[in-house]
A protein has these predicted regions:
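Metal-dependent amide/peptide-bond hydrolase catalytic core
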Residues: 1-147
């Protein structure tokens, strides 16, 4: 049975912005190879969640944050430039600036964006606020750069 109409959707996430071009081209090629001759096939390809691509400047800024955490708070701070899935809002900021953009330095917890399971670890509030303030101070006073 062939339905009168059908719709399909997909949420595509990529590691690099340039990967969208390749994927869109591949999907367009598949759409051209229509199996049902009288069918009307349309493709709407939207780039909704850009990836956050690491730069040398963002890596340097992350290392500075790790040093503050280790040297001043005696704690490790996980930071890497490996893709962690999802689509961070930080990626939108990185598309519009040449300054480094880093993420994953927010409050620790679990269940992000869930209706009834999200929580924050209270013990993470003070050190993360300290880190944020110190990063702003160090950038403002030239102790570290953002280029």
């Amino acid at each position: 049975m062939i339905p009168a109409s059908a719709t399909a959707g997909a949420d595509v996430r990529v590691l690099k912005v340039a990967d969208y071009d390749r994927i869109e081209q591949q999907v367009n090629e598949r759409v051209k190879k229509q199996l049902v001759p009288d069918a009307k096939v349309e493709l709407k390809f939207e780039r909704r969640r850009p990836p956050l691509e690491a730069t040398d400047a963002s890596r340097a800024l992350a290392k500075h944050a790790q040093a503050i955490y280790k040297d001043e708070l005696g704690r490790p701070l996980g930071a890497d430039d490996k893709a962690a899935g999802g689509g961070t809002d930080a990626a939108f900021a990185s598309l519009k600036t040449k300054a480094p953009v880093i993420e994953r330095f927010g409050l620790q917890g679990f269940g992000a964006h869930t209706a009834d399971a999200e929580y924050v670890l209270i013990d993470s509030i003070e050190p993360r606020l300290y880190l944020g303030v110190r990063m702003v101070m160090d950038i403002a006073t030239g102790k570290t750069t953002v280029r």
